[in-house]
């Protein structure tokens, strides 16, 4: 893991919300103009609206370099879909594992180890809070995300319809890290 630059990772506050909304806006615009690996939709997801929901339930985090928000993500125990279908190596009831959602990094900050620091933070947080593991789902062609998670020790748990009702993403790949 690149450790020459350290970032501050904390729960977002209402003061951070506007900047997180702008970050998601910038990232989704960039993805739509380039290769949109996660198939995110500008203005829909992730967005200021989804960030507000996560902030209100205490699951929105931001990564800062100085005063600038360079990344944001959600960490909670809600899979937002049917995770029961996964080929999990270990049965863990819903609510006893954490899930990473909406991990976005500004394009100009990619390749600086932010994603690795975020995943390590999520693993450490889940373990400290007594969860039994961390799970995540990615769009099948989201090679950068899958590579990041596998590099950090996650293992593949199958590709399934999570019953989210997203027609243009019929299946998601599931990954797990158990403690």
What annotation goes with each model-predicted range?
Residues 74-102, 110, 163-166:
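Conserved acyl-donor/pantetheine-binding loop and adjacent beta-alpha core of acyl/acetyltransferases
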Residues 1-18:
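Conserved N-terminal entry element of GNAT/NAT acetyltransferase domains
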Residues 50-62, 78-82, 99:
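A short helix-loop-beta-strand connector motif used in the catalytic cores of GNAT acetyltransferases and
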Residues 57-73:
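Conserved beta-hairpin
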Residues 119, 126-137:
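Conserved GNAT acetyl-CoA-binding A-motif
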Residues 94, 139-143, 150-152, 159-179:
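C-terminal "cap" of GNAT-fold acetyltransferases
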Residues 8, 29-50:
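Conserved GNAT-fold acetyl-CoA-binding loop/helix
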Residues 105, 111-124, 147, 151:
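Conserved acetyl-CoA-binding loop-helix of GNAT-fold acetyltransferases
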């Amino acid at each position: 893991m690149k450790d020459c630059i350290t970032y501050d990772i904390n729960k977002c506050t209402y003061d951070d919300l506007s900047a997180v909304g702008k970050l998601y806006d910038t990232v989704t615009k960039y993805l739509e103009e380039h290769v949109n690996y996660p198939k995110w939709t500008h203005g829909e997801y992730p967005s200021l609206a989804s960030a507000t929901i996560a902030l209100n339930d205490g699951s929105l985090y931001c990564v800062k370099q100085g005063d600038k928000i360079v990344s944001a993500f959600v960490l909670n125990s809600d899979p937002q879909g049917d995770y029961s279908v996964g080929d999990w190596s270990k049965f863990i009831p819903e609510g006893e594992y954490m899930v990473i959602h909406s991990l976005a990094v500004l394009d100009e900050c990619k390749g600086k180890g932010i994603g690795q620091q975020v995943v390590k933070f999520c693993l450490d947080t889940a373990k400290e809070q007594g969860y039994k593991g961390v799970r995540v789902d990615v769009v099948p062609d989201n090679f950068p995300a899958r590579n990041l998670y596998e590099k950090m020790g996650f293992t593949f748990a199958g590709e399934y319809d999570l019953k989210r009702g997203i027609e243009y993403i019929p299946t998601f790949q599931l990954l797990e890290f158990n403690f």
